[in-house]
């Protein structure tokens, strides 16, 4: 993995910082594990914008990732590591002993030729998936389930991980990267290690067009709009004379956004600000 700063051969290249990984496969992805991915432009079925700043971008195929890791007690070999345009992490194509191939998230330290396994009796080794009741306290894991059998939902982006800090009865206590501590059923599956490609956060796109290739449209400040378009719009100068709000008038700084009271009891400590 190398961090490359481009030479300023043009204004658009001047600030570009790229992440170069020579281990990544340079050919086409594995076709049977691809699916179509249609663009919405941030619109719903009525044609109305429901998510701003989405539109355009390069055409992509969705890679079918095995988040469940439910092929138990069958060893697999990592065939290659690949780039995935749909996520910040890289992915690994693994070949199971029975001939099936699947994509998984590529953990840090996993290389082509490594052996991995999922199941209760899998050894504690990077890339192996097993129930958290079988993982030692203090271990670093990723792709953590919230419900047994549902598939990993926590710690899936590049460089992310969760630490198991306690085990009591049917629950384990996890420390998330945000600082939040929460309880999860010990039967839930997690994968050993942290997600790879942690240098992703160091990249610099360098120009607006690179964001447009990714399907991200510009963000316009509310204070630069007219009063008809935003509560901060209009007036003389840049002052809008009120507490900051979203385009729909909802407080935008410090307002609580969590509504799932049903699972509040599993949160031991809130994340730090």
UniProtKB/Swiss-Prot annotation:
GO biological process, one term: cytoplasmic translation
Stretch list, region Disordered: 221-273
Keywords: Ribonucleoprotein, Ribosomal protein, RNA-binding, rRNA-binding
TM stretches of this protein: none
One GO MF term: transferase activity
SUPFAM superfamilies recorded: Nucleic acid-binding proteins, Translation proteins SH3-like domain
Key word Ribosomal protein present: yes
GO cellular component: large ribosomal subunit
Signal peptide start-end: none
Domain of life: Bacteria
Matches recorded under Pfam families: Ribosomal_L2 (PF00181), Ribosomal_L2_C (PF03947)
Biased composition (Basic residues): 253-273
Keyword rRNA-binding tagged: yes
Oligomer status and interactors: Part of the 50S ribosomal subunit. Forms a bridge to the 30S subunit in the 70S ribosome.
Stored HAMAP family: Ribosomal_uL2_B
Family per similarity comment: Belongs to the universal ribosomal protein uL2 family.
Role according to the record: One of the primary rRNA binding proteins. Required for association of the 30S and 50S subunits to form the 70S ribosome, for tRNA binding and peptide bond formation. It has been suggested to have peptidyltransferase activity; this is somewhat controversial. Makes several contacts with the 16S rRNA in the 70S ribosome.
The protein's name: Large ribosomal subunit protein uL2
Organism: Mannheimia succiniciproducens (strain KCTC 0769BP / MBEL55E)
Taxonomy of the source species: Bacteria, Pseudomonadati, Pseudomonadota, Gammaproteobacteria, Pasteurellales
